[in-house]
Structures are given as C-alpha cells and as structure tokens.
Amino acid sequence: MNITALTDNTQGAAGLELYEVYNNGYPTAYGNIIHLKGMTAVGEGELLIGWSGTSGAHAPAFIRSRRDTTDANWSPWAQLYTSAHPPAEFYPVGAPIPWPSDTVPSGYALMQGQTFDKSAYPKLAVAYPSGVIPDMRGWTIKGKPASGRAVLSQEQDGIKSHTHSASASSTDLGTETTSSFDYGTKSTNNTGAHTHSISGTANSAGAHQHKSSGAFGGTNTSIFPNGYTAISNLSAGIMSTTSGSGQTRNAGKTSSDGAHTHSLSGTAASAGAHAHTVGIGAHTHSVAIGSHGHTITVNAAGNAENTVKNIAFNYIVRLA
C-alpha cells in the first residue's frame, strides 16, 4: 500500500501496518514503512527501511515517532547508523582517532605519514588534499592558535621564556682560630755563595837606588866612571864615608828609579754559602672571615624533551 507520508499532527491507523515508500514524501525514494499505533492510545511510531536500488547493497534506515496527544506533531526522521552506514558527520573522515592497539580495525589506517589513493578515498582526500596522512607518532594535537599558524603545521618542542633567581645569604663568620701545631725546627737550604768582580790599579811602588861598586875618588870633586854623576858636597847621592888606609873615600849611588804600578782584573773566588736553623714552635693563627657572598651556578636538568604524564595510543583514521 502506497500512502503519502504523515505530516504535522496527522495520525495514522491503529495497529500494525506496512506501507510502501515510492516517491511519497519519505526520506528515501524507495523502501518500506512499518507503522505502529496502539488500539486505544494516540501515540505512534514509524520505521523506514529504504532500498538502495543496487542488488545486494545495504540501504539506510530511519525512525520517527509522535507522542500520545492529538495535537502532537511527528518528530523529525532520525537515521539509524550501522557498520555499513556509519555516521559521516558523527566522526568525520580524516579526524585522528586514539586507538589502544597495534591491530587496526577494518576500514581504518594508522597515521604514520604514508600516502593514500585519493581516488579510492575521496572523503579522506578532502581532509588531506596532499594525499599524505600525517605522521602522528610521538606528536600531540594542539588547537590552532590565533597567531595565524597553518592547519597541519608542526611546532617543535620548547619551553616558554623565563628567568631564574638565585642568591646566597650574606654571613659574617667573624674571626676564627686555626688549630695549634708544632712544626719543630727546620733548616733553610744552603745558599748565599757568591763571587765578586775585581778591577783597578795597584799603588805605585818599587822605587830604589844602588850603591856604586866602581872607582871612587878621595875628594868631593872626583869624577866617577861608568856614567855616574859627580859627587860634591851638595850632591844628594853621597853615601857614608868609608875609611881606608891613610885616606877618605867617597862613594856614590845611582838615582832612585823603578817605581811602577799593576792593573788588576778578574773574579774573586766563590764564597759565602751558608744555612740557617729556624725554630717554628707550636702556634696558631687568627683568620678573619668577613661578610661576603658567593657565585651560584644553576646546573641544567630535565629530559631530552618536554613531556607530561601520558599513555601511548596509536592514532588511526577512517578510510572513506
């Protein structure tokens, strides 16, 4: 029976009825309607099973109802989704789906940066026109910021710019005393040996005379041989009188000559090496440790990348 689809608050017949859908106002052009209505109540409902027009193919199914008052309107038709007719808008093709297994369900693919056939999966090609499924391994999803980043653009890990403050409190440790220790007696090393350079001139010395041993005369006017100077009472070179037999002899002497000097140069012998014994008795020292600060180094810490507590899932995408 071909009946025009009921609209608004129009009621159908009581009981169970079967209608044929054939271009008569239902969601599909062809199909069958199961109409249900109680014998006494006015509430009713309809189930539409459509025809696909292709042998062996699944067709969509729809359902609607109307409450049990005479002025109640029919609800909109709602499609019944099945594995053969999943909701295209409920989870759009191309949306990443966290999947807790390495075994991928039929009709889906892991998101690992692989290419796909755009002609075989036109809906997926709308989401990824490049024909490449994004590689979601190790990546998280972030809402596109208002700064104008492109959809599907990648952002490497990083931390927000910040500073650290560090200080060491100033402390006055006052004056402290070292522990007492007796170092005993120590000897210095043997040293101090040295030399002196010598240079200069010795004093003039060596001037002398010689007594004449040649001929001599008995008077002051005698002439001495061998080139000696004459002797007279005024001569400075008269030697003391030497007595002879019956006469006095006067002997002469040479002039004073032979005075000379010597130049000196060289190095005096090395001398002066010595050591000392030093007694270092038991003693202490006072050390003043005034108010001061210290430089602080803050060492690097952390992991190779920024992470939060997480559980690893595979991302899969529906192929359609």
From Swiss-Prot:
SUPFAM superfamilies noted in UniProt: Receptor-binding domain of short tail fibre protein gp12
Lineage of the species this protein comes from: Bacteria, Pseudomonadati, Pseudomonadota, Gammaproteobacteria, Enterobacterales
Name used for this protein in its record: Prophage side tail fiber protein homolog StfQ
Pfam families assigned: Collar (PF07484), Phage_fiber (PF03335)
Gene3D superfamilies per UniProt: Phage tail collar domain
Region (Disordered): 147-213, 241-270
Family according to the record: Belongs to the tail fiber family.
Source species, domain of life: Bacteria
Organism field: Escherichia coli (strain K12)
Biased composition (Low complexity): 261-270
Compositionally biased tracts (Polar residues): 172-206, 241-258
